[in-house]
Amino acid sequence: MTAIRKNDMNYTLDDFTKLEKIGEGTYGVVYKGRNRRTQAMVAMKKIRLESEDEGVPSTAVREISLLKELQHPNVVGLEAVIMQENRLYLIFEFLSYDLKRYMDTLSKEEYLPSETLKSYTFQILQAMCFCHQRRVIHRDLKPQNLLVDEKGAIKLADFGLARAIGIPIRVYTHEVVTLWYRAPEILMGAQRYSMGVDMWSIGCIFAEMATKKPLFQGDSEIDELFRIFRILGTPTELEWNGVESLPDYKATFPKWRENFLRDKFYDKKSGNYLMDEDAFSLLEGLLIYDPALRISSKKALHHPYFNDIDTSKLPAGNYRGELQLE
């Protein structure tokens, strides 16, 4: 058994008590647990690997261990990485609510308050900027791996796991991994992708926080692409240099020409839009087709939408991507 140290404390599985199963994530079963040394609650993720017989690739263990260095108030802390009998357990700090569950608690008539929408989006961008500056891409961001607490903080979970372990097509329960937040370059088979994939996901989540409805609800890769095209128009080389060279681009794609994005935010009942001009301008920057032109997390933190945000109570304060000497 190997345990990888955090704060010089060598943890083994015996240091944690499993309390109850709380879900099945992309990578396996998640349990609520207790750290026997500190009595703190933890989330224990038992990673299911495709090749159970061979055990855990050492590259995955090394890669995941590096994630313990990602210490930021808006990133769910990885407290220990434990290998036992060819099983890999990741021990994270425990938060009881994810963004999806939180939004599901809002009544039919109720929307996320505009200050909360702004605060959550800013905090997500702060975490993303911190990780991107350290060359860590999330690649599988969705409301289910954004965790919230009662103090108004939001934290990103599962950072870097996509690269370390790979994203399975189906979850543990054979439920298909959601495509609703996946960037068009990934959907069209790009072999190399950049931090822009996360910015696209943030755009989709930002829109969903405003309307309570997923923006692009596809049930297959091609359905997902066509739903994007129907709202934003089918991309051409003109707005996305290199799109026609992507492996899964087809010249026969239907040519939707109009952009209907703004219509998605019109609330018939009140006659108002669910996003103001600044918010919509940020969203447009996040949903630019060409990943090279899509807004970066650092630029997004300086967008006029956030000019009036009160950062005094935020976990990471007014951090807007300034590099800190560590």
Swiss-Prot record:
Main location class: nucleus
GO biological process: cell division; G2/M transition of mitotic cell cycle; mitotic G2 DNA damage checkpoint signaling; positive regulation of meiotic cell cycle
Compartments (UniProt record): Nucleus; Cytoplasm, Cytoskeleton, Microtubule organizing center, Centrosome
InterPro entries: CDK, Kinase-like_dom_sf, Prot_kinase_dom, Protein_kinase_ATP_BS, Ser/Thr_kinase_AS
Control of this protein's activity: Phosphorylation both activates and inactivates the enzyme depending on the site of phosphorylation.
UniProt-annotated binding residues for ATP: 22-30, 45
Boundaries of every Protein kinase domain copy: 16-306
Pfam family, one: Pkinase
Record carries keyword Transmembrane: no
SUPFAM superfamilies xref list: Protein kinase-like (PK-like)
One Gene Ontology MF term: protein serine kinase activity
Main enzyme class: transferase
UniProt KW Cell cycle keyword: yes
Entry annotation: catalytic residues: 140 (proton acceptor)
Keywords for the protein's UniProt record, in alphabetical order: ATP-binding, Cell cycle, Cell division, Cytoplasm, Cytoskeleton, Kinase, Mitosis, Nucleotide-binding, Nucleus, Phosphoprotein, Serine/threonine-protein kinase, Transferase
GO cellular component, one term: centrosome
EC number of the protein: 2.7.11.22, 2.7.11.23
Physiological role: Plays a key role in the control of the eukaryotic cell cycle. Required for entry into S-phase and mitosis. Acts as a component of the kinase complex that phosphorylates the repetitive C-terminus of RNA polymerase II. May function in concert with npp-16 to arrest prophase blastomeres in response to anoxia.
Protein family: Belongs to the protein kinase superfamily. CMGC Ser/Thr protein kinase family. CDC2/CDKX subfamily.
Name of the protein this chain belongs to: Cyclin-dependent kinase 1
Annotated organism of origin: Caenorhabditis briggsae
